[in-house]
């Protein structure tokens, strides 16, 4: 009775499992939305039931629901309450469930260390599993637990798995070094360094990729570790992971600066014995018009190894290669490579806006140092209306650095389109206006052309205050360079002060300041400008009011100097003492007093303090000091500082640090302590020889010539004659040698079945059954049938005899 009940219960459980599996399959066929709806309807009580289920699919559904709650920061269910139910499933054979439990432990392992220790035993057992993926998962799970008590266990595990036959596991060992170093670098510094040295001597490029990450993160200052691996890393850099390539290039740049001699620049233009000098510390400072660079062979090896990375899809790799050429090569060498083209191509092809802005900043940085690098790609930096604002601003700044006599017409036309078009944001228009000043600085003719276009466009269009401010600032800067040749422009600026009432405070203050600067050249128009400004003094902005005060003081100072000069000349002719300046009778002095009176009661404390300072100077009669302060010539604003916006006037700190020029080491030793070359190849460690089996992937990798293509097509695909012979059957392509030296041969089906021994057939015994009948009629009918049977039996007997004779033979 008990057995029957047990059989019925097991049958019901089996039916339940089959039903749930069928439901899960049906749900998966309905699509992701159906599964999401099912997952969201799992309540807390069902989570406990699913986690305690013996069905791995139900446990997986529960873990997926828990991870989704953790990712969405859903506060409706406290997933930490299921810690014990989750941890006990660590012994499952389902790899996906183990990965989900690993993610759960990352979040909550520190909150309950006692329960976390329950999973340690299972993870340690997985470290000895035959599946390399499970070993890798176990090591990753152990090293990710942020518990100080586990550090010795992890260190012991890392030391054990550093010689694992699987490259994936050894790569995970390198990542575990990073986690241990962050947890307690002072406690395990030497042990981790020894393990890293073993990983750096590995023969597998995948392990080297992970080891480079650990080296860059933990021991980047120990450049001496690269001595025995420098040349090998240069040769295998194309086989590494893209991010590891970037880190390795940065490390090798520092190594070259520290342990390789500085390149020598040889002058080819001089006659007789050629002159030479070390490569300058700053970029593009070589004085020779024609030169060649002599590099150390190891430096040439590193620079040539970068050529295989030109077509890398990772923008960071391209930037790192450009930085290597910027740090270690001459401008001519950098120009002759294809990395400038690759950098421009990466900018145009990438869709990630963060990467594009970073690349544009790098191009702008390099174009400031040497504009000839990017002159062939000027049109690649034209702005499109759909470009983001920051990327558009960087493109315009790059265009401004590329302006010269040969392309100024095209760039000026393009900048005018950005300014006049309504498709571009205001920030882009302002930057385009500021970049026009670079066109005006090429020559006097372009200076007049730019200012004329700006004034005409300003008078014919209704511009916003910020754009109008940019117009005025550009015109003011260009006029200040040569005011005598632009008097007509100056008169128009004077009219703008009264006509354009919407001018921003900064723009109006700039125009007023400009009249104070040209007072020594064209003094006659300045008093009339001051007279107009006094009438609306109280309605002006604080910057404009301050500049009106300074303008009135400057005009009074110039008027006093002109009066003294005229009186000194007249008194010398008449031999009389020069009279004093009449402040009460001078119209300029009266305007100065009016402005001074208004400024003393201004709301801005800066204007009040400045008014008291200026009045004290004039009241003391120290006019020479006043002239020295107010009439001193001001330096012309530099365009490099002017065209950049307030937000992007400098590059980001990351770009500055990335392109920071490293100094060369002058004390270099090429010989080690034993007298050998310090870069002599170190002893490598090949752990693949410990493998006890081989896979189809390894066979195909070692027999790459095996193909279904004909020998006539082999040459078209780059296969040599020997490979084509092996394809056609002449070569020994069916042989394979394992890591431990044992040879195998791939057999065909006929060869495989030919090894099966032939089985001999046994003789069969034939039994004849004869039925008798009492009916005479039936006897007659059966006689004929008996005859037939007799003939058949005789044939069967003869055949059996034949077979028996065959067996006897």
From Swiss-Prot:
Protein name per the record: AP-3 complex subunit beta
UniProt keywords (A-Z) are: Cytoplasmic vesicle, Golgi apparatus, Membrane, Phosphoprotein, Protein transport, Repeat, Transport
Q: What does the sequence similarity comment in the record state about its family?
A: Belongs to the adaptor complexes large subunit family.
Instruction: Cite the record's note on assembly.
Output: Adaptor protein complex 3 (AP-3) is a heterotetramer composed of 2 large adaptins (APL5 and APL6), a medium adaptin (APM3) and a small adaptin (APS3).
- From the UniProt record, report the name of the gene that encodes this protein: APL6
Transmembrane region(s): none
- Please note every region of biased composition (Polar residues): 722-739
State where the protein is found: Golgi apparatus; Cytoplasmic vesicle, Clathrin-coated vesicle membrane
Membrane topology value: Peripheral membrane protein
Disulphide bonds annotated for this chain are none
Q: What does this protein do?
A: Part of the AP-3 complex, an adaptor-related complex which is not clathrin-associated. The complex is associated with the Golgi region as well as more peripheral structures. It facilitates the budding of vesicles from the Golgi membrane and may be directly involved in trafficking to the vacuole. Required for the transport via the ALP pathway, which directs the transport of the cargo proteins PHO8 and VAM3 to the vacuole.
Taxon lineage: Eukaryota, Fungi, Dikarya, Ascomycota, Saccharomycotina
What GO terms fall under cellular component here?
AP-3 adaptor complex; clathrin-coated vesicle membrane; cytosol; Golgi apparatus
């Amino acid at each position: 009775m008990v057995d029957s009940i047990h059989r019925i219960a097991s049958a019901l459980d089996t039916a339940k499992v089959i039903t749930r599996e069928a439901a899960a399959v049906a749900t998966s066929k309905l699509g992701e939305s159906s599964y999401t709806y099912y997952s969201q309807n799992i309540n807390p009580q069902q989570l406990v039931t699913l986690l305690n289920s013996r069905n791995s699919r139900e446990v997986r559904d529960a873990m997926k629901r828990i991870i989704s709650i953790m990712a969405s920061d859903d506060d409706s269910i406290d997933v930490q309450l299921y810690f014990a139910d989750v941890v006990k499933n660590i012994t499952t054979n389902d790899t996906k469930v183990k990965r989900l439990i690993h993610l759960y432990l990352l979040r909550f392992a520190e909150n309950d260390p006692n329960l976390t220790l329950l999973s340690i035993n299972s993870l340690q057992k997985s470290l000895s599993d035959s599946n390399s993926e499970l070993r890798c998962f176990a090591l990753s799970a152990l090293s990710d637990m942020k518990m100080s008590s586990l550090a010795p266990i992890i260190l012991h595990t890392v030391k054990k798995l550093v010689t694992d036959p699987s490259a994936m596991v050894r790569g995970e060992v390198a990542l575990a070094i990073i986690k241990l170093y962050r947890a307690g670098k002072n406690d395990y510094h030497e042990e981790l360094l020894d393990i890293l040295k073993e990983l750096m001597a590995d023969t597998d490029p995948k392990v080297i990729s992970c080891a480079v990450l650990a080296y860059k993160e933990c021991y980047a200052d120990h450049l001496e570790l690269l001595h025995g691996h420098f040349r090998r890393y240069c040769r295998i850099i194309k086989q590494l992971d893209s991010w590891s390539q970037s880190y390795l290039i940065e490390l090798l740049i520092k190594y070259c600066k520290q342990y390789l001699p500085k390149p020598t620049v040889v002058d080819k233009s001089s006659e007789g014995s050629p002159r030479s000098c070390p490569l300058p510390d700053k970029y593009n400072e070589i004085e020779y018009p024609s030169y060649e660079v002599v590099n150390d062979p190891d430096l040439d090896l590193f620079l040539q190894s970068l050529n295989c990375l030109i077509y890398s899809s990772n923008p960071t790799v391209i930037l790192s290669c450009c930085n290597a050429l910027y740090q270690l090569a001459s401008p001519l060498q950098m120009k002759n490579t294809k990395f400038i083209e690759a950098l421009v191509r990466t900018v145009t092809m990438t869709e990630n806006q963060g990467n594009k802005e970073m690349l544009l900043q790098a191009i702008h940085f390099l174009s400031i140092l040497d504009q000839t690098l990017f002159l062939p790609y000027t049109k690649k930096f034209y702005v499109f209306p759909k470009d983001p604002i920051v990327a558009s601003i960087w493109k315009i700044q790059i265009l401004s650095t590329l302006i010269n006599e040969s392309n100024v017409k095209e760039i000026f036309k393009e900048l005018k389109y950005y300014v006049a078009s309504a498709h571009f944001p205001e920030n882009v228009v302002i930057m385009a206006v500021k970049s026009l000043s670079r066109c005006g600085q090429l020559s006097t003719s372009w200076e007049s052309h730019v200012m004329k276009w700006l004034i005409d466009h300003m008078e014919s269009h209704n511009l916003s205050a910020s754009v109008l401010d940019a117009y005025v600032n550009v015109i003011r800067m260009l006029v200040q360079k040569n005011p005598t040749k632009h008097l007509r422009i100056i008169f128009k600026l004077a009219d703008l002060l009264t006509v354009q009432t919407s001018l921003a405070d900064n723009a109006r203050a700039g125009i007023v300041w400009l009249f104070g600067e040209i007072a020594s050249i064209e003094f006659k128009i300045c008093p009339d400008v001051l007279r107009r400004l006094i009438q609306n003094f109280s309605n002006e902005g604080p910057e404009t009011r301050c500049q009106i005060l300074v303008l009135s003081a400057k005009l009074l100072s110039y008027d006093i100097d002109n009066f003294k000069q005229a009186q000194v000349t007249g008194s010398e002719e008449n031999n009389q003492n020069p009279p004093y300046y009449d402040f009460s009778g001078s119209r300029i002095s009266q305007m100065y007093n009016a402005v001074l009176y208004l400024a003393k009661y201004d709301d801005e404390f800066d204007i009040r303090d400045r008014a008291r300072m200026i009045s004290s100077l004039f009241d003391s009669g120290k006019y020479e000091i006043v002239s020295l302060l107010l009439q001193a010539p001001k330096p012309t604003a530099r365009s490099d500082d002017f065209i950049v916006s307030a937000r992007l006037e400098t590059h980001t700190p990351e770009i500055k640090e990335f392109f920071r020029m490293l100094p060369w080491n002058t004390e270099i030793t090429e010989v080690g302590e034993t007298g050998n070359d310090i870069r002599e190849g170190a002893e490598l460690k090949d752990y693949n020889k410990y493998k006890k089996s081989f896979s189809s992937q390894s066979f195909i990798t070692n027999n790459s010539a095996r193909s279904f293509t004909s020998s006539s097509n082999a040459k078209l695909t780059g296969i040599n004659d020997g490979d084509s012979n092996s394809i056609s059957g002449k070569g020994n392509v069916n042989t394979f040698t394992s890591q431990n030296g044992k040879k195998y041969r791939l057999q065909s089906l006929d060869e495989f079945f030919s090894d099966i021994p032939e089985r001999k057939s046994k003789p069969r015994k034939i039994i004849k059954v004869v039925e008798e009948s009492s009916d005479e009629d039936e006897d007659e009918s059966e006689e004929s049938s008996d005859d037939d049977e007799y003939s058949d039996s005789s044939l069967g007997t003869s055949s059996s005899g034949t077979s028996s004779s065959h067996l006897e033979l």
